[in-house]
Amino acid sequence: TKYYGNGVYCNSKKCWVDWGTAQGCIDVVIGQLGGGIPGKGKC
């Protein structure tokens, strides 16, 4: 699992946001097969 900042984590299958870690930031995460790409967040 890789941490991208602002509460965004990705592994080989999906990305997700830990809202506790994000602390109110809004992140757009696009999951792709074989990985994910974190979008630009707005805090």
Curated annotation (Swiss-Prot):
The record's listing under Pfam families reads:
Bacteriocin_II
What biological-process GO terms show up in the record?
defense response to Gram-positive bacterium; killing of cells of another organism
Entry keyword Chaperone: no
Per the record, its GO cellular-component terms are: extracellular region
Say where the protein is mainly found: secreted
Note the biotech application.
Answer: Has potential for use as a biopreservative for inhibiting L.monocytogenes in seafood products that do not usually undergo an adequate heat treatment.
User: What keywords sit in the KW lines?
Assistant: Antibiotic, Antimicrobial, Bacteriocin, Secreted
At the top level, the lineage of the source is Bacteria
- UniProt xrefs under Gene3D superfamilies: 1.20.5.130
Task: Look up keyword Secreted and say if it applies.
Answer: yes
Q: Where in the cell is it found?
A: Secreted
Q: How does activity depend on temperature?
A: Displays a high degree of stability when incubated at temperatures of up to 121 degrees Celsius for 60 minutes.
Q: Which family does it belong to?
A: Belongs to the bacteriocin class IIA/YGNGV family.
The record describes the protein's role as:
Bacteriocin with antibacterial activity against many strains of L.monocytogenes, L.seeligeri, L.welshimeri, L.grayi, L.murayi, L.ivanovii, L.innocus, C.divergens and C.piscocola. No antibacterial activity was detected against L.lactis, P.acidilactici, P.pentosaceus, L.salivarius, L.delbruekii, L.acidophilus, L.plantarum, L.casei, L.rhamnosus, S.thermophilus, P.freudenreichii, B.breve and E.coli.
How is this protein named in the record? Answer: Bacteriocin divergicin M35
Q: Which organism is it from?
A: Carnobacterium divergens
Q: What is the lineage of its organism?
A: Bacteria, Bacillati, Bacillota, Bacilli, Lactobacillales
